[in-house]
């Protein structure tokens, strides 16, 4: 990758990759990422096939520690995201989910990076009743936790993609983006 301040004399082509605001900016992103999906936008910008899954580039994420560390049945959740609009802004949503899962005999492990995250006047906390497995730990440790989870519940965020990449059933809570923006899952809660 080339740093923004670097001067390149003879580049064939350069691309801006990412999410740009306002969302109607069609110079850097020809399509709205909330409608088209980031993975399809990147493919379109690079002139690649925009199919949902490319079997020749499928990556299976595997645990490093193959020994089960938690003997009880458990579920991993991730309640944090990169923007407030992606959060599940239902005041009792996570509380009810955690309570229900515990009644069913599951331990509920929150594997987000931060136990508290936000900006300005909006902050989100780890869901009440969930066990705190948050922290500045390597992604591999989260993969190790996901390995023996019965399933994963999360937002339209990176950890949902990680769980999906491991072949875990993912319950996706979305609403900021359309369902086609993420990978396919039959378990989706729409928040709009």
Task: Give the predicted meaning of each segment.
Residues 1-192:
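Catalytic machinery of carbohydrate-active enzymes
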